[in-house]
A protein has these predicted regions:
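Residue-level signal for pocket-adjacent positions within structured domains
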Residues: 38, 53, 198, 248, ...
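C-terminal extensions of enzymes
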Residues: 191, 219-280
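Glycine-rich phosphate/ribose-binding loops and adjacent secondary-structure elements
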Residues: 58-215
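Active-site-facing alpha/beta catalytic cores
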Residues: 1-100, 107
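Short coil/turn segments at secondary-structure junctions
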Residues: 51-58, 126, 218-225
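A structural-propensity feature for long, helix-poor, extended segments
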Residues: 1-14, 19-23, 202, 206-226
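Short helix/loop capping segments that flank catalytic or ligand/cofactor-binding pockets
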Residues: 26-29, 121, 251
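Short capping/connector residues at structural and topological boundaries
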Residues: 41, 45, 63, 203, ...
Length: 280
């Protein structure tokens, strides 16, 4: 805890997120030794060139209550927002988590719902393609279950998982997310060509490498304009979609604004397929 408190004092650290699950890496993190340079080795407290395997769970947490007590400790000792990231799978663990929040009156400052679409060139394909629910059903499940247990208003819900384009972001907001995360969008704006070399240290665009030779491909002074344009275009397009739907802000989009079409051409509003759940 002492080390955590010291890091929390860093002005450039705005919040902490505990990764309890990630769509692309259910097995946990894996960093090849060829990417572990002197700086990374110093931060991670390993030898330079040593492969790092991060477990997919916290060894001292075995229940929803223990997870929440740990989050509470970090909130109290760090003085900064502490959130959690999860992947939705079976219904029971989700219900256990939400019930524990209500019973203990302990809530993370935010909770990120990651869909199985979350990608990485440094994971097992079998896991990336098959573990966890895709974002739309995952988000629907979480929002409705949180409403059922009467805790939705206590939570800030972030959505993540291939939210690259404005229409996908609009759907996530309409389902009930408060905000979205987009890693892939910013990576592609920075030059990622999805070469699937993330784990090798030989990323040809310089985005996912610590090798100085390959890093030359990424000029931050040039790429910053592309990233800026991506953000501006995303925001403009989101508000354009909202205006077309007759609302003042993307935050005002609801399930009534989303329509799905089946293979026979029949259209059904999302609000009819998945009516909003009223809390207890």
């Amino acid at each position: 805890m002492k080390e955590f408190m010291e890091k929390a004092k860093e002005s450039n650290i705005k919040a902490f997120e505990l990764k309890f699950g990630q769509g692309a890496k259910i097995r946990g993190g894996h960093l090849e030794g060829q990417k572990v340079n002197e700086k990374i080795a110093s931060v991670r407290k390993v030898r330079e060139g040593e492969t790092i395997n991060s477990p997919n769970r916290f060894s001292f947490i075995s229940s929803a209550a223990e997870a929440l007590y740990f989050i509470q400790d970090l909130q109290e000792n760090g003085g900064k927002p502490v959130g959690m990231k999860i992947v939705i799978g079976q219904q029971k663990p989700l219900e256990d988590l939400l019930k524990a929040m209500k019973e203990l009156n302990i809530y993370p400052d935010f909770i990120t719902i990651d869909g199985s679409e979350g990608g990485s060139g440094a994971t097992y394909k079998s896991m990336a393609d098959s573990m966890g629910l895709p974002l739309i059903p995952a988000l629907l499940t979480f929002i409705d279950t949180a409403n059922h247990y009467g805790v939705r208003d206590k939570l800030k819900v972030f959505a993540s998982g291939k939210l690259i384009t404005p229409d996908k972001v609009a759907i996530a907001l309409a389902i009930g997310a408060d905000a979205v995360n987009s890693a892939r969008g910013f990576m592609m704006a920075s030059g990622c060509i999805m070469a699937l070399q993330c784990n090798s240290g030989q990323c040809p665009s310089g985005v996912a490498t610590t090798n100085p030779h390959y890093q030359k491909a990424l000029d931050p002074y040039e790429k910053k304009w592309r990233v800026m344009n991506y953000v501006i275009s995303m925001r403009y397009s989101l508000f354009s979609l909202a205006a077309a739907a007759g609302v003042k802000s993307p935050r005002h989009l609801t399930r009534e604004h989303i329509v799905f079409k089946d293979e026979m051409g029949k259209v059904v509003p999302l609000s009819e397929l998945f009516p909003s759940v009223i809390g207890k």
